[in-house]
């Protein structure tokens, strides 16, 4: 809804503009409650100053501006937890150009090493469907393993062992840490695997300074990290290669904005920064992580944590916050793990409902000090919404068992708390489908599928989630606004899964592992491959540059927009 049509949003716009007069910094500079000894904070995250006059300028020009290629609507579909190689590594060629996938990975890039730095001979496994019924041992001479394995030290096809139709998925709300035994009582079809750890410090250890060789050692799921899917059998691939399908661009150099998991990368999707983890009174308080000399906060089947580097601590701890800025420095070989203070990097719950009754909660983020892209769009009079599967049920107090509270990033901000005008921008996915069918999409739509449909390993089926993605795309590309709409499909983060391409170092937050990304439109002339470097904040950059909005931090200010991808498809 634009400011000119909705008096409540208009009031919020005026309030934001007035408040901006007193805001010193936005987009990532640390407030006094965050402790940091790293001077790069100031250069990496701001400040970016805003005035009321600057905030009002885009409002007058918004109606005359469009997205790259003249598109008038942007739809961002944000899926869950897969690396590029894991899903798209076997894509092949597009319009004669090669997608950078598994075929370009060298043997060294595929090889995983143990904690002592020597290569595994075999890949250890603990997903129940990769260990039983007993698979014929083909690898028995690895000194790092206590049991023989069927898997040698290289990527393997998950589909060869867990097929899309196999009953290996848990019932909704049921935890299965090591996976669901195939055809066991209560098991559902869908070819689910177990979940894999995907956290801030663990990913940095797994990346190993760009060598990409510690994914197995730094994971609770060990060798499953090397599993990949048959790309050309995925529903999304099949759909995009039908005669009637829209054309697409594969962005094969697109990385998650920040190291770690879903909570943090959802924050970077909308705000291009890491939030401060100030706790909420009368709730479980978030804790700082405590690291060993390798930068790891805990042990795993193939990793034994050492004593903490901080002499004031007695044991390592995998907390919700970054490590404390202690006087004792980390070893020189892991200086890249330099984020410290009270930054919330692992999953925490919001102060505003809906939230989980378990887990730490953090105070609402002040939009006047740290605005997000919703604030920018509202101030400019540009219509937008965040659509989430299961939102209406969750907001009424009856959240589905697979509704993920930490996938709702705007709910962590004060201006979107219950009863505020901003709350009107948070809607159920069903309303997105209805709007697309009626030709009433806002200028910018973020779409977050419900847990059972978001492709997340452990609790969701990859093929079922891909089917849901296809249905969303069909809704957009057959609707009245199809030819004026640009769709971006990407994933929040890697889900703990290996990829062979090293992330280019940018700052202390990331980027992390390479993730799948597609740019799609019904009016594209042909499909293409884009090798340009992008990360999650490129979505923000696309919006900001299209509508003349102030960047939220120096990361999105520097990021490439997706204009190049659009140009490739329309040549």
Language-model regions, residue ranges each:
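Terminal targeting segments of Actinobacterial cell-envelope proteins
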Residues: 1-7, 377, 447
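Secretory targeting and sorting signals
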Residues: 2-34
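N-terminal pro-sequences and low-complexity stem/linker regions of secreted or lumenal proteins
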Residues: 34, 39-571
């Amino acid at each position: 809804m634009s400011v000119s049509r909705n008096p409540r949003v208009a009031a919020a716009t005026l309030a934001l503009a007035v408040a901006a007069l007193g805001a010193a910094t936005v987009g990532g500079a640390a407030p006094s409650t965050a402790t940091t000894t790293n001077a790069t904070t100031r250069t990496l995250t701001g400040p970016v100053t805003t005035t009321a006059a600057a905030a009002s300028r885009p409002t007058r020009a918004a109606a005359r501006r469009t997205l790259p290629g003249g598109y008038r609507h942007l739809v961002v579909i944000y899926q869950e937890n897969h690396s590029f190689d894991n899903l798209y590594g076997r894509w092949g060629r597009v319009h004669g150009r090669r997608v950078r996938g598994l075929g370009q990975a060298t043997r060294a890039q595929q090889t995983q090493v143990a904690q002592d730095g020597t290569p595994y001979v075999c890949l250890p496994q603990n997903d129940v469907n990769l260990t039983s019924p007993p698979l014929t041992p083909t690898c028995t001479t690895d000194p790092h393993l206590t049991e023989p394995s069927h898997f040698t030290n290289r990527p393997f096809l998950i589909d060869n062992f867990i097929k899309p139709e196999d009953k290996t998925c848990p019932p909704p709300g049921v935890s299965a840490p090591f996976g669901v035994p195939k055809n066991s009582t209560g098991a559902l079809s869908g070819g689910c695997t177990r979940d894999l750890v995907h956290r801030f410090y663990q990913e940095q250890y797994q990346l190993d300074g760009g060598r990409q060789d510690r994914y197995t050692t730094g994971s609770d799921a060990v060798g499953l990290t090397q599993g990949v899917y048959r790309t050309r059998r995925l529903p999304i691939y099949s759909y995009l290669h039908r005669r009637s399908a829209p054309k697409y661009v594969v962005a094969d150099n697109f990385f998650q904005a920040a190291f770690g998991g879903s909570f943090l990368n959802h924050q970077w999707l909308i705000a291009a920064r890491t939030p401060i983890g100030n706790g909420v009174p009368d709730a479980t308080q978030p804790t700082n992580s405590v690291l060993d000399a390798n930068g790891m906060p805990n042990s795993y089947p193939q990793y034994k944590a050492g004593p903490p580097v901080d002499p004031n601590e007695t044991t390592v701890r995998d907390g919700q916050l970054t490590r404390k800025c202690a006087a004792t420095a980390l070893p020189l070989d892991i200086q890249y793990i330099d984020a410290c203070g009270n930054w919330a990097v692992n999953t925490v719950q919001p102060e505003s409902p809906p939230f989980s009754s378990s887990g730490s909660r953090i105070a609402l983020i002040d939009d006047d000090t740290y605005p997000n892209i919703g604030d920018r769009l509202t101030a400019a009079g540009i219509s937008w919404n965040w659509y989430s599967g299961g939102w209406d049920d969750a907001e009424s107090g009856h959240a589905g068992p697979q509704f993920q509270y930490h996938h709702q990033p705007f709910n962590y901000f004060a201006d979107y708390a219950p009863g505020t005008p901003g709350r009107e921008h948070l809607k159920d996915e069903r309303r997105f489908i209805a709007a697309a069918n009626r030709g009433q999409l806002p200028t910018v739509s973020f779409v977050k599928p419900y847990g059972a449909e978001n492709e997340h390993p452990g609790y969701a089926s990859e093929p079922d989630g891909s089917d849901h993605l296809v249905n969303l795309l069909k809704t957009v590309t057959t609707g009245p606004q199809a030819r004026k709409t640009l769709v971006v499909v990407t994933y929040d983060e890697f889900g703990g899964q290996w990829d062979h391409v090293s992330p280019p170092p940018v700052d202390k937050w990331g980027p992390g592992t390479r993730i799948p990304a597609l740019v799609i439109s019904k009016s594209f002339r042909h499909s293409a491959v884009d090798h340009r470097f992008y990360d999650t904040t490129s979505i923000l950059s696309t919006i900001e540059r299209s509508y003349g909005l102030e960047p939220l931090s120096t990361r999105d200010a520097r990021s490439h927009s997706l204009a190049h991808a659009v140009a490739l498809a329309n040549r």
